[in-house]
Every structure is written in C-alpha cells, then in structure tokens.
Amino acid sequence: LEKPETGTITIDGETQNLAHIHGKDLTELRKKTSMVFQNFNLFSKKTALQNVMEGLIVVKKMKKEEAERIAREQLKNVGLLDHANHYPRHMSGGQQQRVAIARALAMEPKLLLLDEPTSALDPELVGEVLDTIKKAANEGYTMLLVSHEMNFVKNVATRVIFLENGKIIEDGPPKEVFNHPKSDRVREFFAKINRMVEPEYSI
C-alpha cells in the first residue's frame, strides 16, 4: 500500500528489492499476498459471497461459476456459509472479519498479512476470529500478523518480533522471547502485562 524507501522481501523463494520494484513485477508480487485489515474493508453493497468472489473474478480473471465455488468453500471453512447472502450491515464485527479472512484465503496467497485483525472487535467477538486465524495457520498458511493478543501469539506463532518506534528490539521463537527476553524494554512490557492480569483483591 505504501512504497518502502529501502529493503528486500523474499516470497516463495524469490527476492525483490522493494525500493525498485514496479510495473509487472510489483503486480505479480501483490498477487502472492493477501491482506486482512483492522476494519474489515468489505464492500458494503455486496453480499458475503460476492465479497469473497470479487478478487477471484477481477484479479485472477476467474469465471463466475468457479469463483463462486471457491468462495462458498472458503465461507464454509470460516463457518459462515449460511451467511453467504448476507450484507455486511447484517453481520456482527466478528462475522465480517471472518468474511474478510475468507476473501483473503480465497486468493491462495503465499503470504497472508493481518493488521490487528481483532482491534475493532468487542472482546466477546475476538475468540471466533482468533480461532479462524489459528485454523488457517494449522493448515500451513504463512502469516505476518500484527497483534497485541499475547496469549494467541505465544501459542500460534513460530517467530515473534517486537517493534518499538519502527525498530526491532526483540526477535526469536515464542518460547525464547516470552520466557527469556533479552531486551530490557520487552522485560518491562511483560512485567506490566503480568501486573494487569493479577487480581488486586482476594476472596
């Protein structure tokens, strides 16, 4: 969405210089990725089924019948096949985000990008979205997830990166990062989190 000033990215064994990529190469790189946004970004005047079909038809130039078959399959995978003909305004935030995930997975991305996918949800709806993401992870999808859901990250991620002011301050396997952080800042962060979850009273 924004062009980096420097850096490279390697997807599916192919490395690209992000500062110099353009035209056809940029288009092909984008086809290998899918994005799930904080605020769903569904087309409000299209049904759940049509939202999932859109990229398949417009980007992949797929025939409508094949696009619908794949879209229904993905909606079934996220538990929303019975909502195929519902418009976003008739779905909860959690349901809308699951449609957004189905839309992203329908494109068969090599890399799935998720930007705080639960931040716009009521707490009671977070679980259903995290379960959907965990299921996709277990199916072998490669994901880059931005999240403050620490327990989820700890249990699902294979690599954890802590960022502060745009800089990496901790990077490693979840067990190492959560149990033995090297950065003072990360240790401080976990200490604050632990204090927040500890009860301030006893019964």
Identify the meaning behind each predicted range.
Residues 164, 175-203:
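C-terminal boundary and immediately downstream tail of ABC-type ATPase nucleotide-binding domains
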Residues 1-164, 169-170:
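ABC family nucleotide-binding domain
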